[in-house]
Every structure is written in C-alpha cells, then in structure tokens.
C-alpha cells in the first residue's frame, strides 16, 4: 500500500487508476517510462509522463501478474495510512487523495503553469485546478508575512 500511495504522490493518479494500473500500461520511450491508461473517473484514455521517482518505484517492483500493484491490498488503504501516519507521528488527517493533492500542490509551488497542472491532473475544468492554486497563494502569503520588518534605523540611505 505504501508503494501505491508513493506512486500517487509522484503521478497524481487517483486511487482507482493506481489500483487498476497494469504492466501493459507502462511504456518506454528513449529509456524513460510513461503511462498509457484508461482513466476510471472520466472514462478517457490518457498519456502521462513519469518523473524519476515514479520510474524508480516501478522499476523496483517485481512483475507478478498483470496489475502493477497486484500484491498491494487496496481494501482499507485509508486505515493503513492512518496507522502509517500514527507510527510516523503525523497528526494531520491523511487519505489516499492526499497523495494526489500533494502532487498538484507541489507542481504549483514550483511554478508549473496551471494549465500544465490541469493536464497532468486530468481536470476537465480549470476551476478545479484553481482550487489548488488558491492553496499555494495562501501559503505564499503566510510565508511573506513571516519576514521581519526592517527597523527604520537599520536602513541606510544611498
């Protein structure tokens, strides 16, 4: 289950898409991996490039059966995550969707275009992606408010 969650953190895939991902969906181009898969929620075919972390995770898995995460127990994954977080002393509520959320917020935090993020997240409506952008704007606003004020006597005139 940990692998499924980390893979979603690295790809932004929904639980249903990670759970149904098959090895035949994993393709190679110029030694890099990407996914060609059928998205469960939107009933559309998608192509998704993979970051190095997602590639490394896939390459570390043993192929047994057609499903990529065949040995992962997808039932009760949120209960597993709760125990995992408790062991790590993480107090924040975490669900499988947190992985997808983290992927989106990380991209926006690193100033990836909101339109690119929309495509990677397979959001049909940009307004859905804008919800995540608002979160990063609030984070940025809180960050700059933490900066100290300059004392009027510390500022030298040029």
Predicted regions and their residues:
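Basic, Lys/Arg- and aromatic-enriched nucleic-acid-binding interface segment
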Residues: 1-15, 19
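C-terminal catalytic core of Y-nucleophile DNA break-rejoin enzymes
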Residues: 40-83
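Conserved tyrosine-mediated DNA breakage-rejoining catalytic core shared by Y-recombinases
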Residues: 11, 20-57
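Catalytic-site neighborhood detector that most strongly recognizes the C-terminal catalytic loop/helix
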Residues: 39-43, 121, 125-146
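Short basic/aromatic active-site micro-motif
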Residues: 1-2, 74-75, 91-111
